[in-house]
């Protein structure tokens, strides 16, 4: 199954609380932190919520 490499590229300071909660749920704790998650609709939805703060790459 494909995986997503999610990298936080911008700070969450000044963003809404639900965006902060989403970053925490993804496991991102600061700028330039990376996590690898399964490519599932739940994670795609989370990434869509914070798309202005993260970058996403597909990894096999």
From Swiss-Prot:
Quaternary structure annotation from Swiss-Prot or TrEMBL: Part of the 50S ribosomal subunit.
Organism domain of life: Bacteria
NCBIfam families, alphabetized: rpmD_bact
CDD domains: Ribosomal_L30
Family: Belongs to the universal ribosomal protein uL30 family.
Pfam (any one): Ribosomal_L30
Protein name: Large ribosomal subunit protein uL30
GO molecular function, one term: structural constituent of ribosome
Biological process (GO), any one: translation
Keyword Ribonucleoprotein on entry: yes
Keyword Membrane: no
GO CC terms, sorted: cytosolic large ribosomal subunit
Keywords, sorted A to Z: Ribonucleoprotein, Ribosomal protein
InterPro entries: Ribo_uL30_ferredoxin-like_sf, Ribosomal_uL30_bac-type, Ribosomal_uL30_CS, Ribosomal_uL30_ferredoxin-like
